[in-house]
Amino acid sequence: MYRPEKISIRKVPMQREDLIQSMFAPPDAPPVRWRIAPSLVDYPEAVETMEREAAAIADGTADELVWLVEHPPLYTAGTSANAADLVMPDLLPVFATGRGGEYTYHGPGQRVVYVMLDLKRRRQDVRGFVAALESVIIATLDSMNVKGERREDRVGVWVRRPEKPPLMDGSMAEDKIAAIGIRLRKWVSFHGLSLNVDPDLEHFGGIVPCGIRGYGVTSLVDLGLPVMMADVDIRLREAFERVFGPTRTENE
């Protein structure tokens, strides 16, 4: 009797870019509220607002929200933060936060995008959601002729720096231009992403950003693009709508 030969199939882990499927809400869902803070927002106020908005979205009493802010100079420590990565603990205020990830810097000139979406309506896929946020950043950068890239071993968006000395292993230098850190409660996201437009890059020296050693941090202005925050906001919104669907303006 013929017995088919058993074939061993090696499972290859899916890459984050393979997880990008539709993150659109159902067709009858209202547009996502798009809100831009007109001035610097203190971090505790931002957390309180996110908590309140996320709870209302989960309860069905508020529409989804994307909130764009800038913060005064500060560090935040995610749930995986290692105290050794806070290199200069007295340089700036430090806030513990419930988002994933490690230490990061926020300050003027950095666009922080707090994303409060109901993934029950969209897709209950955390890795896919992170990949979608990366796609928003990559598309935003691409609209300004900057090539942003994802790395499987490093969440966030990176740019190659051929003009810099190579890394210790001989590979090309890379700098981080955008970070991502999220939290979910009842499948509603909060926290989000940050894109370096023109922050004080020296402030990143007080931490090991995101716990990743050996890599630098850059910004759009550092790359030679003297862009205005308002222009970046327009491009972010266009990229967001291509990935997540329509938005509507909400004034503060």
Swiss-Prot record:
Keyword Acyltransferase attached: yes
Pathway: Protein modification; protein lipoylation via endogenous pathway; protein N(6)-(lipoyl)lysine from octanoyl-[acyl-carrier-protein]: step 1/2
Entry superkingdom: Bacteria
Top-level class of the enzyme under EC nomenclature: transferase
Entry GO CC: cytoplasm
Binding positions for substrate per the UniProt entry: 99-106, 179-181, 192-194
Main location as per UniProt: cytoplasm
Cellular location(s): Cytoplasm
Cystine bridges: none
One GO term of the biological process aspect: protein modification process
Site (Lowers pKa of active site Cys): 176
Pfam families recorded: LplA-B_cat
Matches recorded under PROSITE patterns: BPL_LPL_CATALYTIC, LIPB
Alphabetized UniProt keyword annotations: Acyltransferase, Cytoplasm, Transferase
Domain called BPL/LPL catalytic: residue spans: 60-248
Swiss-Prot/TrEMBL catalytic activity: octanoyl-[ACP] + L-lysyl-[protein] = N(6)-octanoyl-L-lysyl-[protein] + holo-[ACP] + H(+)
MF (Gene Ontology): lipoyl(octanoyl) transferase activity
Active-site residue numbers: 210
Enzyme Commission no: 2.3.1.181
NCBIfam families on file: lipB (TIGR00214), PRK14341.1 (NF010921), PRK14345.1 (NF010925)
Protein's job: Catalyzes the transfer of endogenously produced octanoic acid from octanoyl-acyl-carrier-protein onto the lipoyl domains of lipoate-dependent enzymes. Lipoyl-ACP can also act as a substrate although octanoyl-ACP is likely to be the physiological substrate.
Other notes: In the reaction, the free carboxyl group of octanoic acid is attached via an amide linkage to the epsilon-amino group of a specific lysine residue of lipoyl domains of lipoate-dependent enzymes.
Recorded family membership: Belongs to the LipB family.
Protein name per its UniProtKB record: Octanoyltransferase
